[in-house]
Regions:
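Short acidic/histidine-centered micro-motifs embedded in hydrophobic/aromatic stretches
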Residues: 36, 52, 66
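Long, highly charged, low-complexity intrinsically disordered interaction regions
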Residues: 1-21, 27-35, 62, 69-74
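Residue-level recognition of oxygen-bearing side chains
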Residues: 13, 48, 54
Length: 74
């Protein structure tokens, strides 16, 4: 059903992909993740997602295998 079906790089994925691939993350939370990333820069760890309102430890735990955090090398 989902177009991506694999770990989601939360530093590059759009809100549609994030909401489709991460359990417990709807479009509202997915948009908040993208906005947080635009404002504060890339996430360094999956746990950094907890800085986004509505994302807690449980969301990170149930999606641990589906969250990918890549950082761009400059």
């Amino acid at each position: 059903m989902a177009a991506y079906a694999g770990p989601v790089d939360v530093n590059t994925a759009n809100a549609e992909t994030i909401s489709a691939e991460l359990k417990g993350v709807g479009m509202s939370k997915a948009k908040a993740i993208v906005e947080y990333r635009k404002t504060h820069g890339p996430f360094k760890t999956a746990e950094d997602l907890m800085q986004v309102k509505g994302i807690g430890v449980r969301t990170i735990e149930i999606n641990a295998k589906n969250i990918l955090v890549k950082t761009a090398s400059k």
